[in-house]
């Protein structure tokens, strides 16, 4: 597969041209990658008005992902999430309401405020972690049935930070029935397209989807995709670049663009086989950890989510692994998360298993968290643009939340802008070590 962006950048780096243009390093080595770090010079195309090498590269990515249109982001899925909400607003059914599973990335809350959306939250029936918000199609059906009109979109995060995956197919069917778009934050699941069978949200019926390529594919940090489904309206496909330009920098990283471009060749050249092999290794690792006394939680195939046993936190377990030369993705009171890809060697997994060792401690039942369904005092937008102050979390009871407070992104916010902070929120602040919160004055 051609790599037009990477090829252009390399040719320019070797050309000996006098760089009388940005950036200021002029290709001289400071970190070592500067020769390949260029700007929108003649022939380099322009990310938001792509007609040349970027357009060609994005079309190759669209073919690989089976989308109606795929566009690049150099600012992660954060930019794509904002763009998805903009598209739902401008190309949807005219509603200014969005229905969202509560475990959103905070950028969703900020985007909803900027676009003046009202948010109707979907809550889990029970939850043992703020990272997960399993929502059944029946729960969504009941929620949509109570609304006076269909929302602009239903928004889900899948996989979540612990690797939990939503039933996208069933949720998409409910969305079609009610005439609303389905947008999925698939930041942690770009690779899902290449499983057999594919379980990528586009394949399962999502209208809009964002993938953080950099999280699970060999792409530099910030590289991401916004995908539009083939069956989606033409207006969604045609407006994708406008939506991205609304929220993106006019100085996109060509290093990141080149890495997205090279990733197309990587995906086309035997990636499915390498992915299948790694998924098999990780399944064997799950069995080995279970046999060694560890409780391994269900998750997407490239993630190991291990519950901390009684007397130990996930953070302490992470320290134990770190001392053996293994750095994890995430740890909290209850869980440890490790993310691996085909770029990890078999020796990495052996080292990881050795670092875990054997667990002889018992596992206590996981308590159900007291989810804080705070009283809505004002809209998210009103709260975020109102004067605020920072107060100790322990003294915030009864105050109105100014900025969304989360233990980690993406996760169920303990309190969202415009909600009154109640006793349950205080308990969660204490549990997750939140010391300060922003509240309205």
Predicted regions: what they are:
Residues 116, 434-441:
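Short, compositionally biased
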Residues 34-79, 103:
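Conserved N-terminal alpha-helix of the aminotransferase class I/II PLP-enzyme fold
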Residues 2-10, 76-295, 308:
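Conserved PLP-enzyme active-site core in the AAT-like
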Residues 1-52, 180:
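N-terminal "arm"/small-domain region of PLP-dependent enzymes with the aminotransferase-like
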Residues 287-434:
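Conserved C-terminal alpha-helix-loop-beta "cap" of PLP-dependent enzymes
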Residues 72, 121-123, 211, 330, ...:
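Structural signal for conserved beta-strand scaffold positions within catalytic alpha/beta enzyme cores
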């Amino acid at each position: 597969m051609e790599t037009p962006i990477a090829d252009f950048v390399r040719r320019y780096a070797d050309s000996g041209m006098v760089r009388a243009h940005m950036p200021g390093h002029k290709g001289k080595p400071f970190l070592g990658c500067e020769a390949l770090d260029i700007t929108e010079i003649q022939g380099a195309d322009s990310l938001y008005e792509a007609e040349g090498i970027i357009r060609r590269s994005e079309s190759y990515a669209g073919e690989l992902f089976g989308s109606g249109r795929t566009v690049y982001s150099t600012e992660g899925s954060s930019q794509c999430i904002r763009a998805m909400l903009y598209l739902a607003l401008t190309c949807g059914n005219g509603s200014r309401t969005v229905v969202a599973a509560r475990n959103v990335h905070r950028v969703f809350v900020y985007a909803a405020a900027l676009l003046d959306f009202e948010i109707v939250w979907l809550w889990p029936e029970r939850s043992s972690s703020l990272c997960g918000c399993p929502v059944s199609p029946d729960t969504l059906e009941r929620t949509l049935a109570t609304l006076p009109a269909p929302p602009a979109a239903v928004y889900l995060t899948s996989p979540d930070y612990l690797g939990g995956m939503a039933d996208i197919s069933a949720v998409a069917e409910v969305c079609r029935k009610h005439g609303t778009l389905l947008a999925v934050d698939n930041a942690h699941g770009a690779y899902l397209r290449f499983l057999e069978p594919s379980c990528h949200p586009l394949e399962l019926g999502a209208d809009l989807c964002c993938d953080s390529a950099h999280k699970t594919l060999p792409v530099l940090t910030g590289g991401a995709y916004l995908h539009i489904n083939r069956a989606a309206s033409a207006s969604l496909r045609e407006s994708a670049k406008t939506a991205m330009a609304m929220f993106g920098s006019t100085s996109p990283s060509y290093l990141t663009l080149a890495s997205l471009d090279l990733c197309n060749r990587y995906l086309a050249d035997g990636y499915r086989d390498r992915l299948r092999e790694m998924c098999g290794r990780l399944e064997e690792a799950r069995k080995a950890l279970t046999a060694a006394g560890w409780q391994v939680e269900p998750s997407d195939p490239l993630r190991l989510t291990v519950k901390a046993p009684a007397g130990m936190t996930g953070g302490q377990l992470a320290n134990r692994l770190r001392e053996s030369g293994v750095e994890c993705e995430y740890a909290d009171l209850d869980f440890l998360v490790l993310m691996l890809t085909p770029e990890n060697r078999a020796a990495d997994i052996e080292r990881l298993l050795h670092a875990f060792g054997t667990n002889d401690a018992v596992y206590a039942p996981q308590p159900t968290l007291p989810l804080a369904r705070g009283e809505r005092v004002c809209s998210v937008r009103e709260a975020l643009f109102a004067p605020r102050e920072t107060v100790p979390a322990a003294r915030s009871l009864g105050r109105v939340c100014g900025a969304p407070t989360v233990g980690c992104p993406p996760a169920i916010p303990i309190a969202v802008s415009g909600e009154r902070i109640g006793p349950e929120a205080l308990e969660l602040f204490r549990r997750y070590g939140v010391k300060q919160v922003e509240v309205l004055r």
